[in-house]
Amino acid sequence: MTRPVFRHDRPGTSASAWTTVLAAHAMVPLQLPSVAGRLVVVGAHPDDETLGAGGLIRVAAIAGWQVEVVSATAGEGSHPRSPTHSRELLAQVRRHELDQAIARLAPGAAVTCLGLPDGAVADHLAELVAHLVAMIGIDGEDVLLLAPWRRDGHPDHEAAGLAAAIAAARTDARLVEYPVWLWHWGDEQGVPWAQVRELPLDDEVRAAKMSATAAHASQVEPLSPAPGDEVLLDAPLRAHFRRDLELFFEDDEPVRDDALDLVHRERSDPWQVESDYERHKRAVTLASLPRQRYEHGLEVGCSIGALAVDLAQRCGRLLAVDASETAVTAARERTAGLDQVEVRRAAVPAQWPSGRFDLVSISEVGYFLSPRQLAGVVERSLAALTEDGHLLLCHWRHQPVGWPLAGPAVHEAFLASGAPVLVEHQDPDFVLHVLGRPA
């Protein structure tokens, strides 16, 4: 378990000191859509969501938003030396408190506790990302995702924030982060003021937040008079969350999602390219090409270069690209003897290569894009085709864990462009299309 950078039982920055600091800064209001959507709230532990964003949860509920709350852990590690409460009992108590708190902020909201180990959320990052992606789904642009600040000073908070940032990048959800422990350990110099967003809280919203905070009794009151059962959030700490406003951070910089690069670093052949399934799929892919020879091909998402080797036999020139530097290195090694092949690192659609191609191959990569990114790839790939060019699509038809799109949805996005379908192949495990350039 990674230790926090602070001690909750040591003196910290006072609420009055922060009041002075905040008064000296003109802060940008938090802009909420005029039409109610979905609010997905992530906490590392029960009470994070109430302390950091209880006011916003209440505001959204009043406005008719669909509110969903997920706590990564049950917070069973809050009192490690308690003589009266085991970790199992604390988990049970805190789950119940979470339900009660959210009922006071957003009656009817869905509440989920994943039960990841308290203090070790970072060790379960992929699991948390996958859960959030599944919650958000394919309509991420309608979702406001709230999560702990990635620089909050507590490892569980920072891991939960990172998981939410990755999930937002994969789904196109809007990410807004809330600080909790910053108010205890931080100071004016530690705040990225350009990212700060302010939400004023009226009396009714503040009262609901205070009531929800009180519902987390195991944290705001002693468990018992015995040593080890002391109050976790004492009055000076709670004072930070009694303000008539809440502050959030909104960072426009995209998070680095290196999951696919990690897959390639951990395994030299992550997709088992010599398996019977992969060999069969490549054979069908090559047999589906309407022409024997192409002048200039582009393969998007080449991975370690297995398909690139085969496509090179059909292309005078082939440019193969992948977002993973590790994959690019492996693909260059695999195609080293093929002078007509160039392998380049590029993340599409942002780094789409220039030029026109009479063959564009997009195979087993579309579902690793967010819906917005996929729309960009559809546009760029069709625009890059020569008049007689072909767009080859081939994707596993099942749902990949941790991403919102499956193969059939990827193909539907391309088919919706109106591009003529020249070849269609439906396999139990994959779907293949060859499209022409739209008229």
Predicted regions located by residue number:
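Conserved N-terminal segment of class I S-adenosyl-L-methionine
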Residues: 2-37, 111, 235, 240-292, ...
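Short "lid" loop at the C-terminus of a central beta-strand within the Rossmann-like core
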Residues: 73-76, 181-182, 396-400
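Short, flexible loop segments at boundaries between secondary-structure elements
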Residues: 172-189
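A short acidic, Gly/Pro-enriched loop at the edge of an enzyme's catalytic core
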Residues: 353-360
